[in-house]
A protein has these predicted regions:
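A short loop-to-beta-strand scaffold at the N-terminal edge of the catalytic core in hydrolase folds
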Residues: 235-240
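Conserved SAM-binding loop and adjacent beta-strand
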Residues: 264-276
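Short alpha-helix immediately C-terminal to the canonical SAM-binding loop
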Residues: 325-327
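Conserved segment of the thioredoxin-like fold in thiol-based oxidoreductases
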Residues: 336-337
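Alpha-helical transmembrane segments of multi-pass membrane proteins
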Residues: 1-231, 243-249, 258-261, 273, ...
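Well-ordered alpha-helical segments embedded in enzymatic catalytic cores
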Residues: 274-281, 347, 351
Length: 360
């Protein structure tokens, strides 16, 4: 493993770059949404940061006449701290910018720059430094550069799939940030030569700081958002459950990105969105409609209303996000064991195309 520690570092740096890019949309989405404009801002800023990192990383590499690998170790150590600051920067800057600036594009660009600019810049610097460290023979510069670039790209491909399919829906953004920071910390230790007792003490202190910053970010988030009682990352979106009180009532809401999807009156248990009761008109126009289909469940406020009002009718709900169903059970009182309710966890369009219960 020691023989390939530079290659491992380059691969993982490429992977972490894409992990950060993917979680950037999850961090920004509750404040500015996740539209094409927001993704454009995120990708543009991160590519800008990376291009600066490649350039300055090359300059640092050329100044490293002795090919001291400790320089790369120090870079990774700094990157670990910069990455661990992401949860704090989300609350301090992104939340503040979203409150006081109306232009979503400006908020997205500034937020991506402040929160992800430095980690992206530092991670990009890894490749040119690694190229210099591997180049003991001028005749092999091309092959070495190609190998390092290939490893970084393969790492980015791996990071894209691993983050999108596994990390985000199962761990959540804050845990992923902590994991990325600790991984960078481990790589920093792995690369450093001539480790002393003093060095190990310093690295232990850094680990404590990394963990503390992560928890501090979570604490500040709760202080600044006391209404949010649940913050969940699913395969499809970031979901907030909040409790909001007015002079008359207390409501529990479900928010996806910047949009309010569902809410209930906590005192009565009734759905808060009165317009949903217009769905009951189906019974006025067709008294024989006993098997109903609803595309999209969210917090299942209407299906629960339906089941209570029409005890002899059945409803099928197609909800693509299984986390929505879980949250509705935990926070909104959905009873998935009701024999008159059937839930399909799939895309609504696919369901309509392929189900055999469709009636025309």
């Amino acid at each position: 493993m020691k023989k390939y520690k530079l290659e491992i570092t380059v691969f993982l740096s490429g992977a972490l770059t894409m992990v950060l890019e993917l979680i950037a949309s999850r961090i920004l989405s509750p404040y500015v949404g996740s539209s094409n404009l927001i993704w454009t801002s995120i990708i543009g800023i991160m590519l800008t940061s990376m291009s600066i990192g490649y350039w300055l990383g090359g300059k640092v590499a050329d100044k490293n006449k002795e090919n001291d690998i400790n320089i790369l170790s120090n870079y990774l150590s700094i990157t670990a701290i910069a990455t661990s600051l992401i949860p704090i920067l989300e609350v301090v800057f992104v939340n503040t910018l979203a409150k006081y600036l109306e232009q979503l594009i400006i908020v997205a660009i500034l937020s991506a720059t402040i929160v992800f600019g430095i980690p992206s810049f530092l991670l990009a610097a890894v490749s040119p430094i690694a190229v210099k460290l591997k180049n003991s023979n001028i005749d092999n510069v091309g092959a070495t550069s190609g190998k390092i670039s290939s490893l970084s790209t393969i790492g980015s491909i791996f990071g894209t799939f691993f983050a999108g399919f596994i990390l985000i829906p199962n761990l959540g953004v804050r845990n992923i940030v902590l994991g990325c920071s600790i991984l960078l910390w481990i790589l920093s230790i792995m690369l450093l030569k001539n480790k002393t007792k003093k060095y190990y003490i310093l690295m232990l202190v850094e680990l404590i700081v990394i963990i503390a910053l992560n928890f501090l970010g979570g604490y500040i988030f709760k202080i600044n958002n006391p209404d949010i009682i649940k913050d969940v990352d699913s395969e499809y979106s970031r979901i907030w459950v909040t409790e909001v009180a007015t002079e008359q009532n207390k409501y529990k809401t479900l928010q996806v990105d910047t949009g309010l999807e569902s809410y209930i009156n906590q005192e009565t248990g009734e759905m808060g969105a009165e317009y949903l009761k217009y769905y009951d008109l189906f019974d006025y126009y067709n008294k024989n409609a006993n098997d109903i289909l609803m595309i999209g469940g969210a917090a299942y406020t209407y299906p629960m209303h339906f089941l209570e009002k029409y005890e002899n009718k059945k409803i099928d709900v197609v909800e693509i996000d299984s986390k929505m169903t879980e949250i509705s059970e935990q926070e909104f009182g959905l009873d998935t064991t009701n024999p008159n309710l059937k839930i399909y966890t799939t895309d609504g369009r696919s369901f309509l195309n392929y189900n055999d219960k469709k009636k025309v």
